[in-house]
From Swiss-Prot:
Gene: aat
GO cellular component, one term: cytoplasm
The species this protein was found in: Desulfotalea psychrophila (strain LSv54 / DSM 12343)
Protein name according to UniProt: Leucyl/phenylalanyl-tRNA--protein transferase
SUPFAM superfamilies noted in UniProt: Acyl-CoA N-acyltransferases (Nat)
Pfam families in the record: Leu_Phe_trans
NCBIfam families: aat (TIGR00667)
Family annotation (HAMAP family): Leu_Phe_trans
Entry function: Functions in the N-end rule pathway of protein degradation where it conjugates Leu, Phe and, less efficiently, Met from aminoacyl-tRNAs to the N-termini of proteins containing an N-terminal arginine or lysine.
Chief place where the protein resides: cytoplasm
């Protein structure tokens, strides 16, 4: 029984419990900051290909990392402690999102990070909701990730690396910062096998929704990520 909701001008969404088994919940609307934030509050995110209408998803079960249960293998942690790379936050957001898109097309994969998505998340970044982590080899950007932070939740969107381990290092760095900032949940959206090594777990759509109601209270603009 397939019901996909068509969104109208007001920025509300149907309840995530109406999502299809593949996660599809709604179609249409726009990528305004208000609509995106309303979506993320309930764990709903846009994901679509060029030429498609905007598709909104609530994937379930949900793949998440609890920062206080994060693990990384001994060998990786050894590399992490010895790395000469430097890490920053919010220093090159538009470069990071651009490279997340182009690294996929470079591998012959389709990218959902279309120009209008880059623009929309760039606006969320300017408003203090979207953040990037950068990995630098001196002054060359060699890895990064970006996502949206609301209250105690970081919604990971995408990552890229041009050298081995750099995106994994960005994840370790993100978790360290998340712990300092009181972020209690990192949403990985899809079940991605390589995240299992970091202690990522699958939880039900209901449990994820309950987490969000608890961790995202009335959101004002997020405080800046200070290092």
């Amino acid at each position: 029984n397939m019901t996909v909701f068509r969104l109208n001008r007001d920025c509300t969404f149907p309840h995530p419990k109406h999502a299809e088994s593949d996660g599809l919940l709604a179609v249409g609307g726009d990528l305004s900051a208000k609509r995106l934030i309303n979506g993320y509050r309930d764990g709903i995110f846009p994901w679509y290909s060029e030429g498609d209408p905007i598709l909104w998803w609530y994937t379930h079960p949900r793949f998440v990392i609890y920062p206080d249960r994060f693990t990384a293998g001994k060998r990786l942690m050894r590399y992490w402690k010895k790395t000469s790379y430097t890490f920053t936050i919010d220093q090159a957001f538009s470069q990071v999102i651009g490279l997340c898109g182009s690294s996929r097309t470079g591998r012959g994969e389709e990218t959902w990070i279309l120009p209008e998505m880059r623009e929309a998340y760039g606006q969320l970044h300017e408003l203090g909701y979207a953040h990037s982590v950068e990995c630098w080899d001196v002054d060359r950007l060699v890895g990064g990730l970006y996502g949206v932070e609301l209250g105690g939740v970081f919604f990971g969107e995408s990552m890229f690396s041009t050298v081995s381990n750099s995106s994994k290092f960005c994840l370790i760095y993100l978790v360290e910062q998340a712990r300092k900032r009181g972020v209690q949940l990192i949403d990985c959206q899809m079940t991605t096998r390589h995240l299992l090594q970091f202690g990522a777990v699958e939880i039900s759509g209901e449990k994820f929704y309950q987490h969000l109601q608890l961790l995202i209270a009335d959101i004002g603009p997020q405080p800046a990520w200070k290092i």
